[in-house]
Amino acid sequence: MTKVLVLYYSMYGHIETMARAVAEGASKVDGAEVVVKRVPETMPPQLFEKAGGKTQTAPVATPQELADYDAIIFGTPTRFGNMSGQMRTFLDQTGGLWASGALYGKLASVFSSTGTGGGQEQTITSTWTTLAHHGMVIVPIGYAAQELFDVSQVRGGTPYGATTIAGGDGSRQPSQEELSIARYQGEYVAGLAVKLNG
């Protein structure tokens, strides 16, 4: 069985919703075992609550377990064009995996969210840098998801990976089109992983 991990950080629930859609898409692939986990929260609980953070139910991952998966699909909100501090802190703990080459050749893909759309592509491509140092095979989604051609409404989604636009106050939830792109990303990456493990 090919093991696929959807690993995310979500403060307000947008990336959590996208992660579920990515996992739903990946689960369509025969031969793929899909696991959804989150990275640990680094904010003090009182500050997280005061900021309106949403309680997450997914189990917390450890950096060492990344070596157990054939493909990892990372989800992170944008922080000034980069991954969130929580995801950065988690990945900064993977030095031992890097030293041993434990992630070399594993598939990696990234999805993201932004407040207003600024930085969504940059967040994905800047995350790729860390994954490339691990020797992971980076999987963009291209334009195969037909929703990427729809310009009739505001929406996220890029050839680099699925995205959602949360709005400046976070009130906008992922649209059906954005979730469809996320499902496509999960199915596409899981399908490639199964073929490579074939």
UniProtKB/Swiss-Prot annotation:
NAD(+) binds at Y12. It comes from the Bacteria. FMN binds at residues 10-15, 78-80, 113-118, 133. The keyword Flavoprotein applies. Its cofactor is FMN. Gene3D superfamilies: 3.40.50.360. PROSITE patterns: FLAVODOXIN_LIKE. Binds 1 FMN per monomer. Residues 4-189 form the Flavodoxin-like domain. It catalyses: a quinone + NADH + H(+) = a quinol + NAD(+); a quinone + NADPH + H(+) = a quinol + NADP(+). This is NAD(P)H dehydrogenase (quinone). It comes from Shigella dysenteriae serotype 1 (strain Sd197).
